[in-house]
Amino acid sequence: MPTFNSNGATLTYEEHGTGEPFILLHGLTGNRHMFEHEVNILKKYFRTIVLDARGHGDSEKPSTYTLDDHIGDVLRLLDHLEIDETYLLGVSMGSYIAQGVAIASPERVKKLMLVATKSQGKTSSMEALFAKHADELEGLDFSEKVVKVSPYIFHDLKAVGKWSHKAGQQSPSLTAKEISAANEALEGFDFREDLHGITAETLVISGDHDGLNQPEAGRETARLIPNATFVEFNQSGHAPNVEQPLLFLDFILEFVDQK
């Protein structure tokens, strides 16, 4: 699997297909395999690239890192692959990274897609949800907590469970320390005053059953980006791409002019 060096960390990525570049960024504790279904469709039209974020999947896992590190990693991936401009899609944590990239280098993002997003947070959304339900989660480890709160996060638990299990089998599991570092990287960010600098046409998709990043957070993000459209899926939670996959790909392909 190809790798590149980003500020001292070795990160793993995959490429599929040819054409204009299209980069997909996964969520917290996820990996590049989370986008297997999307890649199988997008590679017919695009040079499709999926990255294991720093601290995730097969990429190197430093003991500490930040959201700025994630953003820099994507910019260095563009440099490594000699990409001047790309379509950029991020889900949850990936959408925060995508916002940061589009703010830092607006000329390098052709179109921006933000899924299950927010534009600010004192903690990771998962840690905030755990705190909200602290009494019922007492004594549980991270994985057990995720299972317990899943009904607050997703609408189609069966589809999400199958998807996350399959993706999880294809990459190393994160240790408790690695999960903690991944959560800490998302503490205390706020892009709201900078979103006006995003020049790319933007599509924001939220699920109306998402208790992690509620639709209003996506709606706020869309309001603050000059050329953004907000869409709310009514049978999805935090994973619209998994819970309503056909509708999701219809919106994405139409947005990038492939329908």
Predicted regions and their residues:
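Catalytic active-site module of serine/aspartate enzymes centered on a nucleophile-bearing elbow/loop
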Residues: 228-259
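Conserved alpha/beta-hydrolase catalytic His-Asp/Glu region
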Residues: 123-125, 142-194
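Active-site loop/oxyanion-hole signature of alpha/beta-hydrolase fold enzymes
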Residues: 36-40, 49-89, 250
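Flexible "cap/lid" loop of the alpha/beta hydrolase fold
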Residues: 99-103, 110-139
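Short beta-strand/loop motif that positions the catalytic acidic residue
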Residues: 198, 204-206
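Acidic catalytic loop of the alpha/beta-hydrolase fold
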Residues: 209-213
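Gly/Ala-rich beta-loop-alpha elbow adjacent to hydrolase catalytic centers
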Residues: 90, 94, 98
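Conserved HGGG/HGGXW glycine-rich cap/lid loop of the alpha/beta-hydrolase fold
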Residues: 7-60
